[in-house]
Each structure stands twice: as structure tokens, then as C-alpha cells.
């Protein structure tokens, strides 16, 4: 599995190349539009798997208001999935509202985990 750090570096590389950016950005926007998570009230960072120590640490570092909002969105999405419904377009998450609120915390937790691994494996 790729780390979020490597994904961010790849995204920065793509965005720094105008030709790649003209091809990849519209495709990624189309993918996000058809993925359907926004129609269930979720943001992209809400669908990242949280069953690993780095994600658990990143989620625990979220400010209280972001954490409550995230939990509310996930519970709402579960309820919509159980009832086989989607949010009306007025309540669905808009593309400009779909911010990467969790990525800085994940990058920080990955950096700390990498540093800890390096220090644990140091040879004197």
C-alpha cells in the first residue's frame, strides 16, 4: 500500500507538469463526480481506511469540531446506505466543500512513524 506521503509527492509532480495536469486533473474530477461519496454527504478524507495505526493517530489528533463533523457525515452515510437513498442535491457535498482536512495530520503521523522506525533500527 502506498503511503499518503508518496501519493502527495506524485500529485505535486503531476500538478507541476502542465501537460500531465491538463490530462489527469479533469479525469480525477470526473472520477470524484461519479464515485458517489459526495451524494452520501461524505468528503474524500472520510473514505480513507482508518484501520491502521497511522490513520488512528491522525484521526485522534483532529480538532474536536472536525472529529464530530466527520463522525456525523459517516453516520449519515451509513443511514443513507441502509435506506438505499441519496441526499438531495442541495444537501450533497459540493466539490469546493470537499477539502482535504485530514491529509496534514496523516502526513505528520507518517513522518513520526518513519522517524521512529529509523531510530528503532539505528546501529551504533
Outline where the language-model segments fall.
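Hydrophobic membrane-targeting and insertion signals
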Residues: 1-7
Amino acid at each position: 500500500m502506498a503511503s499518503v506521503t508518496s501519493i502527495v509527492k506524485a500529485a505535486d509532480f503531476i500538478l507541476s507538469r502542465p501537460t500531465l495536469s491538463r490530462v489527469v486533473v479533469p479525469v480525477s474530477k470526473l472520477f470524484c463526480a461519479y464515485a458517489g461519496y459526495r451524494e452520501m454527504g461524505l468528503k474524500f478524507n472520510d473514505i480513507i481506511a482508518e484501520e491502521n495505526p497511522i490513520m488512528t493517530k491522525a484521526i485522534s489528533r483532529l480538532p474536536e469540531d472536525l472529529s464530530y463533523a466527520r463522525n456525523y457525515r459517516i453516520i449519515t452515510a451509513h443511514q443513507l446506505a441502509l435506506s438505499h437513498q441519496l441526499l438531495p442535491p442541495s444537501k450533497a457535498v459540493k466539490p469546493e466543500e470537499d477539502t482535504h482536512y485530514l491529509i496534514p495530520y496523516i502526513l505528520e503521523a507518517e513522518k513520526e512513524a518513519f522517524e521512529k522506525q529509523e531510530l528503532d533500527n539505528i546501529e551504533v
